[in-house]
Regions:
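Alpha-helical transmembrane cores and adjacent cytosolic helix/loop segments
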Residues: 1-215
């Protein structure tokens, strides 16, 4: 590998690490605020938003492990093994998020829970919409440049966080304006197809990676 290529790999890895460190820091803060405000407001989408932030922390930690375990000078086999494990971690977090949202949203619909209007939820979703798309795009671009399917998959989870921000804003906003108690859980459930599909796609990529390693 040429010196220029090595320096580029080092720079890309450094950028990826900083993106994941930022993801962890932002989502830890977001989770505390969202879950706390959601419990006070009785908001399924807001709590689910906070749990999603926590789950995204797990995904980001998995990517940090992958990046630190297999650096720019790692052997091909070592990098491949780390990439495969990171893909499985990201896939698991997608399914974990889908299961949680399903449980909480259906429970809210069956019990006809009416959340209080949550200004915190609206502000939080707006802030997240301002940050998450840019973060997701940066991860996606870096992952493709590195040839890391795990980082690209993690960027998709960050995109899901953006979608949930929009769903949260719609759900809480409709309740505040029109009093539609069901808008909150429906907004959360509307994200399920995207989340499950991305989880399945990531799991498929992990299996393909596994098969390639054993070919």
């Amino acid at each position: 590998m040429s010196l220029i290529a090595t320096e580029r790999r080092v720079a890309l890895r450094r950028r990826a690490l900083w993106l994941e460190y930022f993801t962890v820091g932002w989502n830890v803060l977001e989770a505390f605020v969202a879950i706390g405000a959601g419990l006070l407001a009785g908001s399924v989408a807001l709590i689910g938003f906070g749990v999603d932030s926590g789950i995204e922390v797990i995904s980001a930690v998995g990517l940090l492990w992958r990046l630190r375990t297999a650096g720019p000078h790692a052997e091909v086999a070592e990098e491949s093994a780390a990439e495969k494990r990171a893909l499985y971690i990201v896939a698991a977090t997608f399914f974990l998020l889908a299961a949680y949202i399903t449980y909480e949203a259906i429970g809210s619909l069956l019990e006809r829970e009416e959340p209080l209007t949550s200004p915190v939820g609206i502000v939080l979703s707006i802030l997240s919409l301002a940050v998450m798309p840019a973060l997701a795009f940066a991860k996606q671009r870096t992952g493709r440049a590195m040839g890391s399917r795990a980082l690209v998959a993690d960027s998709k989870e960050t995109w899901v966080c953006s979608y949930l921000s929009l769903a949260l804003l719609i759900g809480v906003g409709l309740y505040a304006v029109a009093g539609w108690w069901w808008a909150d859980p429906i907004a959360a459930l509307a994200m399920l197809p995207v989340i499950v599909w991305q989880g399945w796609q990531t799991l498929t990529e992990a299996r393909e990676h596994h098969d390639a390693d054993h070919a």
